[in-house]
């Protein structure tokens, strides 16, 4: 069985780096194709237990779409200003042709609604609710720009 220490490596600056494939994304997480949602929630909780400075090196750059979803939730307790600032930063990076990846575990704990839902400690019930909302893509009915202005 893998341990967290086996899943991380030290990055050049001394920060640990997590190479998490399709499990955790900047602002989101991967799809759950089969198996219980609880298992994905448990996996995310393990990753969230890493030090806040741990670099999150995910397999895909979906950050802007994930933050679009996060802004659409208007989730109580989701740090609105931090989320808005992160979205604006990612927009600027993407306009320059740069990636918003890697992220950091601490930033994900603050602004990633799927990770935050997994951390609720309710056997994955909150995570499943938020994951299904993301899967519905209903958030795309409101533009990111409109959400940033609200």
Give the label of every model feature segment:
Residues 1-74, 129:
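Catalytic core of the metallo-beta-lactamase
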Residues 42-55, 62-150:
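Accessory terminal helices/loops
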């Amino acid at each position: 069985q893998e341990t967290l220490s086996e899943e991380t490596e030290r990055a050049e600056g001394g920060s640990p780096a997590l190479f998490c494939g399709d499990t955790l994304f900047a602002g989101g997480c991967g799809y759950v194709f089969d198996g219980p949602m609880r298992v994905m929630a448990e996996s995310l909780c393990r990753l969230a237990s890493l030090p806040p400075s741990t670099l999150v090196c995910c397999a895909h750059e979906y950050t802007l779409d994930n933050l679009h979803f996060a802004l659409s939730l208007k989730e109580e307790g989701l740090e609105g200003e931090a989320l808005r600032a992160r979205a604006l930063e990612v927009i600027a990076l993407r306009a320059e042709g740069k990636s918003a990846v890697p992220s950091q575990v601490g930033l994900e704990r603050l602004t990633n609604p799927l990770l935050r839902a997994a951390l609720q400690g309710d056997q994955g019930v909150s995570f499943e609710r938020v994951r299904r909302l993301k899967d519905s893509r209903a958030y795309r009915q409101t533009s990111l720009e409109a959400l940033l202005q609200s």
